[in-house]
Structures are given as structure tokens and as C-alpha cells.
Swiss-Prot record:
A cellular component term, taken from the record's GO annotations: cytosolic large ribosomal subunit
Assembly notes: Part of the 50S ribosomal subunit. Contacts protein L32.
Name of this protein: Large ribosomal subunit protein bL17
Lineage: Bacteria, Pseudomonadati, Pseudomonadota, Gammaproteobacteria, Oceanospirillales
Record-linked InterPro entries: Ribosomal_bL17 (IPR000456), Ribosomal_bL17_CS (IPR047859), Ribosomal_bL17_sf (IPR036373)
Entry keyword set: Ribonucleoprotein, Ribosomal protein
UniProt record, GO biological process: translation
MF terms (GO), sorted A to Z: structural constituent of ribosome
Homology family: Belongs to the bacterial ribosomal protein bL17 family.
Top-rank taxon: Bacteria
């Protein structure tokens, strides 16, 4: 029976799934927006949001936990210096998932995952 077993398998073994979500979380935090399939996007929320919550309180222990989960020194720096202070007043819900139709090749439902309250990029044409 499958009672109370949360999370999606996504046809991968556990180490592959863990590595995939670690990489996706780092990409999302680095670029602040990524495009992926809808089930992966919904599962990514469970990985990325706790990292931002962790970054709201800067301590050596929290930085080490974040490094353990991302394996990227640059991302730990960005989390604690930029993203943590940005979301200090927000009690969760740091990620927005927008549905964006279906992929051409296999008709998989696609989604655009972005951080809320991210700074808008200004085009050079508008200046």
C-alpha cells in the first residue's frame, strides 16, 4: 500500500532524483526563473523553498546546511546575501509556477518556475 508516501518518483531512482532536484534548485536560485515540466516544477517547490527559508537567518550552521544541500559555494553566498534578506518579511511562498502549455515533442505539460518579487530586468532599448 502507498499510504502516506509523499513525493513523486518521476521514473528515476532516488540518487538520480536527488541529484536532479539539487541541480534544478541551484539553477532556479541562480537564474531566478527556469522552464521545466509541471510535475518536476511542483516537486522542485519542496526542495527550493526550504533553502530560502533557511537563508532568512544567517548563521554558520545554516550556511553549512545550505552548502550540504546545494554543493555550491556561490549559491550559498547568493542565498544568504541576496535572497534571504529579500524574502525576510515573506512567510513562505517564494516560488511561482506558471503553466505554459505542452511540449512539442511529447506533449508533456510544461511550467515556468520563478521566484516571486524578483527584480524586473530593464531592456537596453527602453533606456
Amino acid at each position: 500500500m502507498r499510504h502516506r508516501k509523499s513525493g513523486r518518483k518521476l521514473n528515476r531512482n532516488s540518487s538520480h532524483r536527488q541529484a536532479m532536484f539539487r541541480n534544478m534548485a541551484v539553477s532556479l536560485l541562480e537564474h531566478e526563473a527556469i522552464k521545466t515540466t509541471l510535475p518536476k516544477a511542483k516537486e522542485l517547490r519542496r526542495v527550493a523553498e526550504p533553502l530560502i527559508t533557511l537563508a532568512k537567518e544567517d548563521s554558520v550552521a545554516n550556511r553549512r546546511l545550505a552548502f550540504d544541500r546545494t554543493r555550491s559555494k556561490e549559491m550559498v553566498g547568493k542565498l544568504f546575501n541576496e535572497l534571504g534578506p529579500r524574502y525576510q518579511e515573506r512567510p513562505g511562498g517564494y516560488i511561482r509556477i506558471l503553466k505554459m502549455g505542452f511540449r512539442a515533442g511529447d506533449n508533456a505539460p510544461m511550467a515556468y518556475v520563478e521566484l516571486v518579487d524578483r527584480p524586473e530586468l530593464v531592456d537596453a532599448d527602453e533606456e
